[in-house]
Amino acid sequence: FSKKRIESVEVTKIHYDQIVKVKIQLAEEELELAGLIDSGNQLYDPLTKTPVMIMHVSSLEHCLPSWLTEQIYSKTEIPQIPENDSGWATKLRLIPFRAVGVESQFLWAIKPDSVQVDHEGSSIVVNKVLIGLNTQQLSTNGEYQCIVHPKMLISQKMVIA
């Protein structure tokens, strides 16, 4: 068995369309959100192969500098990072993506300080993940605030709760 084949077997064990608790730490702020495990989320950073979870930008707005949220809402594709705030340069990525009925475009993504997913009685610390910042609401009824990439639940460090 190759590692890729074993991971594909593990993916089939995950219950999709399940709501999980997601804890995110970013810029000395901690958020706790409901996340939907979505098999349709196959978004990766093409350079690092890091999985990308999706979140509405308003959920993180209080953690982000105003210049960044303005650029995300205006769909700026070339980041303009102020010199006095250059620490954000190492946390930002632009991820190419396609959605149904939409031409190819870019999604702003940010590298969080830490992410933890509570799934089936275990806490999973996800070290390799990006948060894609979407400008469209994800859930019409507010049931979840982020879309969890299934790869976040595989090959990660499990912490017994």
UniProtKB/Swiss-Prot annotation:
Active site: 38
Family stated for the protein in its record: Belongs to the peptidase U4 family.
EC number: 3.4.23.-
Enzyme class: hydrolase
GO BP term, example: sporulation resulting in formation of a cellular spore
Superkingdom of origin organism: Bacteria
Alphabetic keyword roster: Aspartyl protease, Hydrolase, Protease, Sporulation
GO molecular function: aspartic-type endopeptidase activity
Disulfide bonding pattern of the chain: none
Record keyword RNA-binding present: no
Known function: Probably activates the RNA polymerase sigma-35 factor at the stage II of sporulation.
Protein name: Putative sporulation sigma factor-processing peptidase
